[in-house]
Every structure is written in C-alpha cells, then in structure tokens.
Amino acid sequence: MLPIITYLDLETTGATPLRDRITEIALVRFENGIEVARWQTLVNPEKSIPAFIQQLTGIDNEMVANAPTFKEVPGILAKYLDGAVMVAHNVRFDHGFLKSEYRRLGHVLRQRVLCTVKISRSL
C-alpha cells in the first residue's frame, strides 16, 4: 500500500513567513497512487502585494480582493493534508508559510513533509 501524498504549491506576498502572507494555494491528493482530489484557490492576504511579486506570480491585488482569507480555508486544507505526506518543491518555504498562517489563527500545524529539492539534489 502506498502512502497518501498531497502535492502542494503556494504563492505568497514575499519570502518571509512571519511578515508575508499566502496569495494562492494549489493541492493534489493521491491515495494508493491514484489522484483522488485537487483544489486551487486564490487567498486574500489582507495586505498589498508588492509590484515585483505581482510581476513574478501574475497575481495582483484586484485578483485577491474578493478571495477567501486564510482563516476560511483550514477546513478544506485538512481534507487534503490529514493523514498525508505533504510534498513540495522547497517544502521549507511552503510548510513555513502554512505553519505561520495556522499560528496566526491560534493553531499548530503538524505535517509530515517531503522536499523534492532535496530529492533532486541527491540524484
């Protein structure tokens, strides 16, 4: 039996989880090697997105103005992350942002993680 894996990618307002915020979340969950669910949403960071980040990600303030804030998404995230190994390219970045967002809500995120950057460097 294969582990449950959720692939995650985030876009953010910058590189510092304590100061910056998530602007987009994309997830794909696999169970026994089969894709069972996928989800993507823009997230209102409740702060302005710097111009260079807008150019980098293509996400601007207008696009996120009516998007859910992070406090509206943990229930959905749980459906993808519970019981799964979270896989991301440079997982420290994505995991750090998720942990910071959960901390702002008074919660703790405990998640098993796997980094594709580390895997690729070992090949």
What does each of the following model-derived ranges do?
Residues M1-Q111:
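Conserved non-catalytic scaffold segment of RNase H-like nuclease domains
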